[in-house]
Amino acid sequence: MTEDTLPDTVPDTVLDTVLDTVLDTAISEPSMTAGEVEMQLFALERSRAQFAWKCGGLDAAGLRKPHPPSAMTLGGLLKHLALVEDQNVSIALTGQPLGAPWDAVDFEAEPDWEWRSAVDDSPEDLYALWRGAVQRSRAAWAEALEDEDLDRPSKFTTPSARSPNRRRFLVDLHDEYARHVGHADLLREAVDGLVGEDPPQR
């Protein structure tokens, strides 16, 4: 759902709230002659779109609903994957410390902070956090891969002074989504019965 697909009768105050909880689920197909970089980025974007479809448009109750015996929630997934996006860029591409809100958290003392604290966040804040992290990550990877060289070393150095290449971190990011999209499938079905693999496209 986008602004131009909403009824004309929706008041502006309601429209702002609705759009705050709507996530982009568009999937752009790769070219028929796509190389490795284009295909890797397409796979990541498709998983992001699938995740957005399963998490988008919900109120606080929907985002906080667990699927027993697991305590996992869609809100927790949004916050966790926002952290993963920012960590991936920080570790692999920039070598810079994490910014807000992550820099104020002692993850050694609270390793599950993003999962636990999501219950206190509004839907608008959770959606904005995830959107912002995706935008930063997308921009950072686009800049890093202007040379289309996934073999270049990342900014991360192991204790043995080795640096995994950028391919490793891009695959790791997609793998994290692939894992959690499956969780989101089950959680969303339990909320309102939504099922399916890919979000409907125009």
Labelled PLM ranges:
Residues E110-R152, R167-E176:
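Acidic/histidine-rich alpha-helical segments that form the ligand environment
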Residues T2-T5, V37, L41-C55, A60-D112, ...:
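Short, contiguous alpha-helical
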Residues M1-L6, D24-I27:
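An N-terminal RHG(E/S)-centered segment typical of histidine phosphatases
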Residues P7-V22:
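Long, intrinsically disordered low-complexity tandem-repeat segments
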